[in-house]
Each structure stands twice: as C-alpha cells, then as structure tokens.
Amino acid sequence: MYYYLEIECESPVKDIFTCNKRRASKVVGNSFGGDHFNFRLGEIKLLSMDFPSSKVPEVEETSLGHGVVHLYRVFPSESHEFDAPGLILAILAIPLYMSPSDVLGFLGEKHCKSIQHIRLLKTKDPNRIMALLKFKDQASVIRFYTEFNGKAFSQIDPETCHVLHIDKVNIKYPMESSDSSSTEQQLVGPSSKPFASTTPALIELPTCVVCLERMDSSITGLITIVCQHTFHCPCLQKWGNSSCPVCRYTQKVQSSEFQSKCTVCCYDKDLWICLICGNIGCGRYHDAHAKQHYVDTAHCYAMELETQRVWDYAGDNYVHRLLQSETDGKLVELSTDGKSSGWTGSSATESKLRDKMGLEYTQILVSQLESQRLYYESHLSNMSQKLSRVNEELVLKTKIATASSNANTDLRSRVDISESKLKKRDDKLKRVSSQLEHLKHNYEEEKSMNENLLVRIQTLEKQNTTKSDQIVSMQFQINDLNEQLRDLMFTISASQEIQKMGQSEELQNGTIVLPNNSTVRSNSVKSKKKKKKKPVVPSSSGSLGTD
C-alpha cells in the first residue's frame, strides 16, 4: 500500500529535503479555500536533520506558515502492484514528548547510517508530528519497515509506530498560479510511476474525531455504527457513553441554538421525525405534514419527538421497541413519557395493543431463537471441523510417536551394546593400568639401581685414577732403583775385573765414565720390550790413561 503526501502552506519551499527557500509574500486572510473555514488549518513547522560526514546531525527549524497536511492513499494498478518501494518512509503520530534527539535514539545509530534526511512536520494539533525519512537504498527501506512498523515508542505508553511508504511529496502554495503553484518531489526508482496533476481522483484519508488520527483500514481496525459514523475500534471502546460521540455533540449544539420545527409550516409542537431521512413534520392533528412525507417518499417509520415512540404508517400502528438493560442485559420495553395522539384509554384498545405486543414479542423471540440456532449450528460445524482436524493431527502425532518409540527402542539397544563394549574397554583399561603401574614400579627400582651403580662406578673410576697415579710414581721409583742397581752392579763387576787384571799401569792411570741419567731413563723404557743384555765393560786401554 502506497501513499501520496500533499502539504499546502504559505511559505514556499522548493525541496522539502534541501529546504531551499524562495521569497514569499505575506498572506493576508484565509487563502485556503476562500471564505470557507478549514478546521485543520494551522501553523506548520519543519524540523530538518541531515546526516553529513559528521556523526551528530544539525537540527534546523523552519516555519512553513499556516497550512494543511493532506495524506492520500494510492491504489496501485496491477502492472505496478509488485514494484519495489521508493526511498521515502513516513512515521505517523509521533508522541509530543519525543524530541528530535529522542527520535534519533528511537531509530538507532545503525539505521541512521542508512538515512540521508529526516524531516519532522509539526502542527498545532496534539499527536500530529509526522516524520519523513529519506533512505540511501531500497534494502534499508525494506529492513526499516519490517523492523519498526508496529513497534512501541516506549515500554510505558501504548503508542505504536505506524510506517507508510510515500511515493510522492507535493507542496502547494495557494498564493501562486496553478501552473507554478506546486513543487513536486518525485522519487527516482523502480516503483516511480506518473501521478495525476490534480488530486480530485485521490481520496483523502478521513480523521477520527476521538484521537484526531488518520483512519486507515490497513493499519488499524475501523467500525461504523448505526448513524454511519466511523471510528477506530480502540477509540470507540474507550468511549464510555453508549451514544455516538458525533451525534451527541451535534445534537447538543442544535438543541442549544434552535428548536425543532416542521420543515413545511414551521410548527414547533406535535412533531414527528422520519427515521429514514431525518425529515421533521407536524402531526395529523395539525397539518399532517409527516404523513404527507410518507405519501411522497414511502418512508413508513416516524418517531414522535416528545414521547420517542415509533409509528408505522404502513401497518397504521406503533412499533414495539425493546431495549437492552445496562445492568443485567435483559430486554425491557421502552417507557413512554406521555400518551401519543392516537392513544385511547378504552379496555378494548388496550387488549388489542397487548395482543399485538405479545405477537410482536413472539415474532422477535422466534427470530432471535432462529438466529441463535443458526449461530450455534455454524458454531457446531466449526467445532466439528476443528475436531476432525484435531483427530487428524492426533493420528499423525500417534504415527510420529510410534515411529519415535521404534527409533527410541533401536537407540536403546544400540546404547546397551555400546555400554557392554564400554565396560569391556574399561576392564581392559584397568588391566593395562595395573600393568603400567607394575612396569612403572620396576622402572623406578631399576632407575634407583642404575643410579647406585653409576655412583659406584664413579667412585671406582676415581680410585682407579688414584691407583694409576701411584703405579706411575712407583714405576719411576723402580726405574730409578734399577739404574742404581745397574750402576752398583757395574761398579762391582768393574772392580772385580780390575782385581783380576792386577796392578797394571794403564788401569792405574785410567778414568771411569758413567752415562747420564736422561740416557739411562730413555733406554730403560726401551729395555722393557727387548731382552735385557749384559752390560759390556769397556776396555781398560780405551778408558784409562797413563801418568
């Protein structure tokens, strides 16, 4: 459902979303509709909020002068029925306690990023703040409409957010000519389609007299009562009186301003009003203009204004009227304030009237019983249909339950098998754990034994090193002693040879030469590998000198 917005104001604005103003002459008097006073005429204020690169938008207030805001509903054709929506949405009936900052907080930072411009239209009437939102893309429009349509403004108050798709915004200036009197703002998008240049073909949405809001059957429920006045269903529920709010007000005004008179002769007594068209005429005891109205129009029901009794010209008798009591809800007869012009006090007439009243009561009772029978039969048929649907659902649920039970049994058997396998694995795990503990204990014992052996080996290695050093030192001592022994043996053998040789002059003047210690030591190492040789005694001639 799409809507068309028309703003008729004094101050010209070229574009409502850019607020480029032109010079406007001062308007004197009522330029909206000539001499006819428009009760909706009032001052219109425009609050502009744009979203530039900065995060916080600037709020500018512009006065459009006195004017009227019209909202029309557009019925799209079949070819344009499934077109994508435009880029403009309208929020109706924003509460007065919400400031522009509250509106921004209600919209949220996420949606404000996808909005280019926000315009708030304020009028003098309460709850008449309308917000126009222009978005950057159609996806944001659809997402915003889905999320915010029907959303409550706050958790305390019952007001809800009503979001509408606006296809076109038209601004009219009554002081200019018809060709240049309006500045139209047309959306560019797949849903844009041409509109008529004039608005007589469009139907403006009516206003509820209780809450002063637009009445749209696609948004809220509407109810039309007997007097053909239409209201919002919640508004009529809040109205405590049983009478119509409009009729009650208009009847009070009429009764205070003037007195009812016959429309033909202006007679102000014994008046009868037609229940079909509301014509007032005098009774048959004056000029019988009420009956003449029945002859001319065939409107057979007329009510006497003094006694509130209804006369049937076709049946030539009074209509029996029953009212529902407000206390217990029973049907009671309408009481009369006085006798009518055709009432007689004779017992025959009273008996005849009682018979007619009884017959009418019987007819009413029969008709009510018939309507109740039809109602309860339809109710029983609905209940039987519901019962059949419930039985079908029960059969389906029984099948589903049986299948679920079979699946549950299968799952239980699988669970039992899995539990037995799990138990076996637990036993095996326990055995492996005990073996692991035993091996760990053996490992600890072997580890302690290895540590002890390692300490012992280190001690033995130290002892071995010490013994090796001792052996080396003793070997040196042995070598030294061997050298000394060799020298001693050499000396002894030499002395013996000398003694054998006798007292010769060569031996007396000779010199004994001994080898160095270093040579002896090096030769001692080689002597370990070779056989020990007998020392050679040098000749006395080579080693001894003469005096």
Curated annotation (Swiss-Prot):
CDD domains (UniProt xref): RING-H2_BRAP2 (cd16457), RRM_ETP1 (cd12717)
Biological-process GO terms, alphabetical: protein ubiquitination; Ras protein signal transduction; regulation of signaling
InterPro entries reported for this sequence: BRAP2/ETP1_RRM, ETP1_RRM, RING-H2_BRAP2, Znf_RING, Znf_RING/FYVE/PHD, Znf_UBP
Pfam family, one: zf-UBP
Region of interest (Disordered), ranges: 514-547
Zn finger residue spans: RING-type: 208-248
Cellular component annotations (GO), alphabetically ordered: cytoplasm; cytosol
Location relative to the cell: Cytoplasm
Organism superkingdom: Eukaryota
Compositionally skewed regions (Polar residues) per UniProt: 514-523
Zinc finger (UBP-type): 245-338
SMART domains to which the protein is assigned, alphabetical: RING (SM00184), ZnF_UBP (SM00290)
Gene3D superfamilies: Zinc/RING finger domain, C3HC4 (zinc finger) (3.30.40.10)
GO molecular function, one term: ubiquitin protein ligase activity
Membrane spanning stretches: none
Chain residues that bind Zn(2+) 1: C262, C265, C282, H289
Binding residues for Zn(2+) 2: C274, C277, H293, H299
Listed Basic residues bias regions: 526-535
Keywords: Cytoplasm, Metal-binding, Zinc, Zinc-finger
Entry function: May act as a cytoplasmic retention protein with a role in regulating nuclear transport.
Record-linked PANTHER family: BRCA1-ASSOCIATED PROTEIN (PTHR24007:SF7)
Protein name: RING finger protein ETP1 homolog
Source organism phylogeny: Eukaryota, Fungi, Dikarya, Ascomycota, Taphrinomycotina
